[in-house]
Swiss-Prot record:
Protein's gene: rpsG
UniProt organism field: Mycoplasma mycoides subsp. mycoides SC (strain CCUG 32753 / NCTC 10114 / PG1)
Gene Ontology molecular function: rRNA binding; structural constituent of ribosome; tRNA binding
GO biological processes: translation
Record's protein name: Small ribosomal subunit protein uS7
Keywords: Ribonucleoprotein, Ribosomal protein, RNA-binding, rRNA-binding, tRNA-binding
Stated family: Belongs to the universal ribosomal protein uS7 family.
Length: 155
C-alpha cells in the first residue's frame, strides 16, 4: 500500500464563468487531452441553454448538479463469505464528482446529433429534475434504501 495519500490538486476557475465546477466539467468531458474542444463543447452548450431557457446558464448548470448529487451510495463489503451492498454517506467532494460523471455519461448516451446539444438538453432536463442522470441518482438512493438493513456493516 501507499505510504501517503496523494493530495488533492485544486483546479483553476474557468476564464468565462469564473467557476471551478465548470473547469471540472471541462476536465471530465475532455478526451485525449483536447481541452480546446472540451471548452467549446461546454461553452456552446451553455449558449444553447441561454437561448432555450432565457436564464443564466451557470445557474441552470448549478441547479442541475444540485439535483444530480447523490447523498447515499453502495459499497460492496465481504463478510463471512457473503457480499453485502452497504449504504454509506457520500462526501461533498465525491457528490460533485459523481454528479459530473453521471451528467456527462448520460449526455453522451442521448440521441441528439452533436455533443453540445446532448449536453445542453441533459443539463436542462437535470435542472428540471428529469433525465437519465437524475434517474441514476434516484436508482442509487432506492438501492441504498433497499439495503438499509446492512447499514450496521459500515466502516
Amino acid at each position: 500500500m501507499r505510504k501517503n495519500r496523494a493530495e488533492k490538486r485544486d483546479v483553476l476557475a474557468d476564464p468565462i464563468y469564473n467557476s471551478k465546477l465548470v473547469t471540472r466539467a471541462i476536465n471530465k468531458i475532455m478526451l485525449d487531452g483536447k481541452r480546446g474542444i472540451a471548452q467549446s463543447i461546454i461553452y456552446d452548450a451553455f449558449n444553447i441553454i441561454k437561448e432555450k431557457t432565457n436564464k443564466e446558464p451557470i445557474e441552470v448548470f448549478n441547479k442541475a448538479i444540485e439535483n444530480i448529487k447523490p447523498h447515499l451510495e453502495l459499497k460492496v463489503r465481504r463478510i463471512g463469505g457473503a457480499n453485502y451492498q452497504v449504504p454509506i454517506e457520500v462526501s461533498a467532494e465525491r457528490q460533485i464528482t459523481l454528479a459530473l460523471r453521471w451528467l456527462i455519461n448520460y449526455a453522451r448516451l442521448r440521441n441528439e446529433k452533436v455533443m453540445t446539444i446532448k449536453l445542453a438538453n441533459e443539463i436542462i432536463d437535470a435542472s428540471n429534475n428529469i433525465g437519465g442522470s437524475v434517474k441514476k441518482r434516484e436508482d442509487t438512493h432506492k438501492m441504498a434504501e433497499a439495503n438499509k438493513a446492512f447499514a450496521h456493516y459500515r466502516w
